[in-house]
């Protein structure tokens, strides 16, 4: 506020020497102070006051219990502040005044009380022999905020009358008063005005929680009066023990001590008492070259709970491409004095870029064609052939080949049929060959399928022909008795023949499928005979349908869905892998819109959630896949899922805002998502999140299209305007104020602690008001906006609106055109034209105007619209009558000579009787990469000229609010 300094020039009093220096530029000590030589007398502080642990007391609390202790004071050894006049022996007078702790010291409004104290000043005599002066019973009286200006003005007046450092502590132009000594004198009107202005200015900046002691010694002159002033000395700062910024900073607990290098992860931190607008969370790392990296946690005053808990988001690490964890430190830091807490360790770990493990699965070794064949001879061919691991027709010594192990079907004498390797070259999925094992996730209706006669042995005895594929162990034959051996040989022979017949039937079935494929070229001929194997899962729990989607084989997905349609389809299309991902989840994650449509067509279930509780709507909104989200929202089951929270308590609309996806947000709003739904952690709505992320595009979309409740509250009563004010966002504060936000709504956070209340007398004890957006205003611009001052942004050359030729249309032509656009036909009215002209996002605002078509034309003119584009839009609508009206205007000379109507002449009905549109057309987010229609559409609003005129003003709010500020602003926000 230095620009408002009334002492910046001498014009106020029309004197050449008056007020030539600002009080902000006053030096700590005046250059005309005498007796400031190395050999002469000087004042020295022997014992500094104790900086922390002493409480400032209010008048109603009575005197302090014990005086201000010295810095070295201990429980059993008390000490107090002391000064000494050096190089001098004789009578002297020492005064003590309270001064501020800023760079430039000024008188403080608090008062010293105790023995030898009067009017807030302590006066003690020294000498004639002992030149050490102690102050054993000093107390500090805390003035209330309401009386700061009054007390400070009286204190400055007293200092000027007595000559107690007025040039140093009041204003440099009053330095000459010290020469008059301590005698009473009358102040001139000019001097009184200087004092009043100085008191007013210093009141705004005064910190009531900290003071310093200024010691000044006066030596007697030739007349015996104490007028010879020694150079004053100033003590260390003394902090009120009840003030938040007086306590020692300390981190008590954090719920996390590690986070990703990309930052943005939420952490809950418990601490000793802090001041919500004077605290930072600092991350730092000391580098080997001596440098220091630092980053600061992201939070606003609304994220500080009762001065003891902070919820913040971690900063991004200096290098997001690290390959191993990096150790840093985190600490609390006070903004005002840069005091820090003891640092705590924090670990940054590398970014997990493949949280869904899609890339990992894609990078696995792809199967080679040669891997499907063994190295031996015959049908078995060494481990990869049709009949398992045998090396040739009768081989029995080969080891099991790779691929899926097929169950034995109750034949213990034979190894499982080893199929060729799958896409992952794994042996998992169907359980490996063990006695009487079953399929993993085997379909319940598999026995009813066409393969039942192959998979189940017949009741009748089957005689096998040809040699047995497997032989009994010779070791067993040697040990068993002869009769037992014969019986066993018969059983084995029976089982050999039975198994061989079934294996040959299976081979014939696959051979026929291969012939059919050769004739038709349709891969579904091969897939059909293996359709029951689609339920097999690999070591990650993925089925063939999961893998086909992961590897982007869209046509294969369609083929699999076709051959498995029917009784086993539901089990396959909704099967989850080990990450609880269904094929539909993976199709959304891999951005395959066509596959999503195919899965939905065959009945994929939208309601299934992944391991984090995310539905497919959450996943699409998180990745910003608006096309896929649109496909999902068309499903009949989407309406039941659209407001479902995930494991973090976030709805899809919350995630769309957090992902900065305007298109997804618009789709969700249009589909009926609950705009005012609260996330389940703290009760924030989508509008709270948009303000928290400083995203005016999304905030405008929620207000204009979603009709969001502008004064919606969190669990602690915080509104979006609280957040905007606390973060100092002028644009969002102006937008919310224009939408009708109430700057006087109190949240549940006490404005102050009852013990620290500014004034107990005259107030109802125990009743503490909540905090309003006005109380939280981080700067004067936000404060003024909340008090009704119009928002005035600084425009750059890029902000200049384009110029069109719509103004060439005469008033009569525009009125005729507007009349044609007011017809109820949905294909030819103003709403359809707005969509064609790119202004459809403002249709909700247009409807609130008494003449929507006229408002539309005014907006189109402001946006730089052209007649050519207007005619083309009308042509697309097939509105020949409207086109003829425009063409006729240019055929009539009299009409073209008419003066065009201006936007300021247009009659616009206000949406609210008091709150203005507040330059919504100026609220462009120059840093945004997407356009909500709020950046460009707010530019296109024709409200800007009406804002500067005398006509009615447009606003977004529905409830009238009128707030103002009477008188000058005093005090610090």
UniProtKB/Swiss-Prot annotation:
Essential for interaction with HIF1AN: annotated span: 648-682
GO biological process terms, semicolon-separated: antibacterial innate immune response; apoptotic process; B cell receptor signaling pathway; canonical NF-kappaB signal transduction; cellular response to angiotensin; cellular response to brain-derived neurotrophic factor stimulus; cellular response to carbohydrate stimulus; cellular response to cytokine stimulus
Molecular functions per Gene Ontology: actinin binding; chromatin binding; DNA binding; DNA-binding transcription activator activity, RNA polymerase II-specific; DNA-binding transcription factor activity; DNA-binding transcription factor activity, RNA polymerase II-specific; DNA-binding transcription repressor activity, RNA polymerase II-specific; double-stranded DNA binding
Interaction with CFLAR, as annotated region: 435-973
Domain Death: 803-890
Phosphothreonine: residues carrying this PTM: 948
Keyword Nucleotide-binding: no
Domains as described in the record: The C-terminus of p105 might be involved in cytoplasmic retention, inhibition of DNA-binding, and transcription activation. Glycine-rich region (GRR) is a critical element in the generation of p50 (Nuclear factor NF-kappa-B p50 subunit) by acting as a proteasomal 'stop signal', which leads to limited proteasomal degradation of the C-terminus, while generating p50.
Subunit structure: Component of the NF-kappa-B p65-p50 complex. Homodimer; component of the NF-kappa-B p50-p50 complex. Component of the NF-kappa-B p105-p50 complex. Component of the NF-kappa-B p50-c-Rel complex. Component of a complex consisting of the NF-kappa-B p50-p50 homodimer and BCL3. Also interacts with MAP3K8. NF-kappa-B p50 subunit interacts with NCOA3 coactivator, which may coactivate NF-kappa-B dependent expression via its histone acetyltransferase activity. Interacts with TSC22D3; this interaction prevents nuclear translocation and DNA-binding. Interacts with SPAG9 and UNC5CL.
PANTHER family named among the record's database cross-references: NUCLEAR FACTOR NF-KAPPA-B P105 SUBUNIT, NUCLEAR FACTOR NF-KAPPA-B PROTEIN
UniProt-recorded name of the protein: Nuclear factor NF-kappa-B p105 subunit
Gene: Nfkb1
């Amino acid at each position: 506020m230095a620009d408002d300094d009334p002492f910046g020039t001498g014009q106020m009093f029309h004197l050449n020497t008056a007020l030539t220096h600002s009080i902000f530029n006053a030096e700590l000590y005046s250059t005309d102070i005498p007796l400031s030589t190395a050999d002469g007398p000087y004042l020295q502080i022997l014992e500094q006051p104790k900086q922390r642990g002493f409480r400032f007391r209010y008048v109603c609390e009575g005197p302090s219990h014990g005086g201000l202790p010295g810095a070295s004071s201990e429980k059993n050894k008390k000490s107090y502040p002391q000064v000494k006049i050096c190089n001098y022996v004789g009578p002297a007078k020492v005064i003590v005044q309270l001064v501020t702790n800023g760079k430039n010291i000024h008188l403080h409004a608090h008062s010293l009380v105790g023995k030898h104290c009067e009017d807030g000043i302590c006066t003690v005599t020294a000498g004639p022999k002992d030149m050490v002066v102690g102050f054993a019973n000093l107390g500090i009286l805390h003035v209330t905020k309401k009386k700061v200006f009054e007390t400070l003005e009286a204190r400055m007046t007293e200092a000027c009358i007595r000559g107690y450092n007025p040039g140093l502590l009041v204003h440099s132009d009053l330095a000459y008063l010290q020469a008059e000594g301590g005698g009473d004198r009358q102040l001139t009107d000019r001097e009184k005005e200087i004092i009043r202005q100085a008191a007013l200015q210093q009141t705004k900046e005064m910190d009531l929680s900290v003071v310093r002691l200024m010691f000044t010694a006066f030596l007697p002159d030739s007349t015996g009066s104490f007028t010879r002033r020694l150079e004053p000395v100033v003590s260390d700062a003394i902090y009120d023990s009840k003030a938040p910024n007086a306590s020692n900073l300390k981190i008590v607990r954090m719920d996390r001590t590690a986070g990703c290098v990309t930052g943005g992860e939420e952490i809950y931190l418990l601490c000793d008492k802090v001041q919500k607008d004077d605290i930072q969370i600092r991350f730092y790392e000391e580098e080997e070259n001596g440098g220091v990296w630092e980053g600061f946690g992201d939070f606003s005053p609304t994220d500080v709970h009762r001065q003891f808990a902070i919820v913040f988001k971690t900063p991004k690490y200096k290098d997001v491409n690290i390959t191993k964890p990096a150790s840093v430190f985190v600490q609390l830091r006070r903004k005002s004095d840069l005091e820090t807490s003891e640092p705590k360790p924090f670990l940054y770990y590398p970014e997990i870029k493949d949280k869904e493990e899609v890339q990992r699965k894609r990078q696995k070794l792809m199967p080679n064609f040669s891997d499907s064949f063994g190295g031996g001879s015959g049908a078995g061919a060494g481990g990869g052939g049709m009949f398992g691991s045998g090396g040739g027709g009768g081989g029995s010594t080969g080891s099991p080949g790779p691929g899926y192990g097929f169950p034995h079907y109750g034949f213990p004498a034979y190894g499982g049929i080893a199929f060729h390797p799958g896409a992952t070259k794994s042996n998992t999925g169907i359980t490996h060959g063990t006695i009487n094992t079953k399929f993993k996730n085997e379909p319940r209706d598999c026995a009813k399928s066409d393969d039942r006669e192959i998979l189940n042995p017949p009741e009748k005895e089957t005689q096998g022909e040809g040699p047995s594929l497997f032989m009994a162990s010779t070791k067993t034959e040697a040990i068993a008795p002869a009769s037992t051996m014969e019986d066993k040989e018969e059983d084995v022979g029976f089982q050999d023949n039975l198994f061989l017949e079934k294996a040959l039937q299976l081979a014939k079935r696959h051979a026929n499928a291969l012939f059919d494929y050769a004739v038709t070229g349709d891969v579904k001929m091969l897939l059909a005979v293996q359709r029951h194997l689609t339920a097999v899962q690999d070591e990650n729990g993925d089925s063939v349908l999961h893998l086909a989607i992961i590897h982007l084989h869209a046509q294969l997905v369609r083929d699999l869905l076709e051959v498995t349609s029917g009784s086993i389809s539901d089990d396959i299309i909704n099967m989850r892998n080990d990450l609880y991902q269904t094929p539909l989840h993976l199709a959304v994650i891999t951005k395959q819109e066509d596959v999503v449509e195919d899965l939905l067509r065959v009945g994929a279930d939208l309601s299934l959630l992944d391991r984090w509780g995310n539905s497919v709507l959450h996943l699409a909104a998180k990745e910003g896949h608006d096309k896929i989200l649109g496909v999902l929202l068309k499903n009949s089951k989407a309406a039941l899922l659209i407001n479902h929270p995930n494991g973090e308590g976030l709805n899809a609309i919350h995630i769309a805002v957090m992902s900065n996806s305007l298109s997804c947000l618009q789709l969700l709003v249009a589909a009926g998502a609950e705009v005012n739904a609260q996330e389940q952690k703290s009760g924030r709505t989508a509008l709270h999140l948009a303000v928290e992320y400083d995203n005016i595009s999304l905030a405008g979309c929620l207000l204009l299209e979603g009709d969001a409740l502008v004064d919606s509250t969190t669990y602690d009563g915080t509104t979006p305007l609280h957040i905007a004010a606390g973060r100092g966002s002028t644009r969002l504060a102006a937008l919310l104020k224009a939408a009708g936000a109430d700057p006087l709504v109190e949240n549940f956070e006490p404005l102050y602690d009852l013990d620290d209340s500014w004034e107990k007398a005259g107030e109802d004890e125990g009743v503490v008001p909540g905090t309003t957006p006005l109380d939280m205003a981080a700067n004067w611009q936000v404060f003024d906006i909340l008090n009704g001052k119009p928002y005035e942004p600084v425009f750059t050359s890029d902000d200049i609106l384009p110029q069109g030729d719509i103004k060439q249309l005469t008033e009569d032509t525009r009125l005729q055109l507007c009349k044609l656009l007011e017809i109820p036909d949905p294909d030819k009215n103003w709403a359809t034209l707005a969509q064609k002209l790119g202004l459809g996002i403002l249709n909700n605002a247009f409807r609130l105007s008494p003449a929507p078509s006229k408002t539309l034309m005014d907006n189109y003119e402001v946006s730089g619209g052209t007649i050519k584009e207007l005619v083309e839009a009308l042509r697309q609508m097939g509105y020949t009558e409207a086109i003829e009206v425009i063409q006729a205007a240019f055929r009539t000379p009299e009409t073209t000579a008419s003066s065009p109507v201006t936007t300021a002449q247009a009659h616009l009905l206000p949406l609210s009787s008091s709150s203005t549109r507040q330059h919504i057309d100026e609220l462009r987010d120059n840093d945004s990469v997407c356009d909500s229609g709020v950046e460009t559409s707010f530019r296109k609003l024709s409200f800007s000229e009406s804002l500067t005129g005398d006509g009615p003003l447009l606003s977004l709010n529905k409830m009238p609010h009128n707030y103002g500020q009477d008188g000058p602003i005093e005090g610090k926000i």
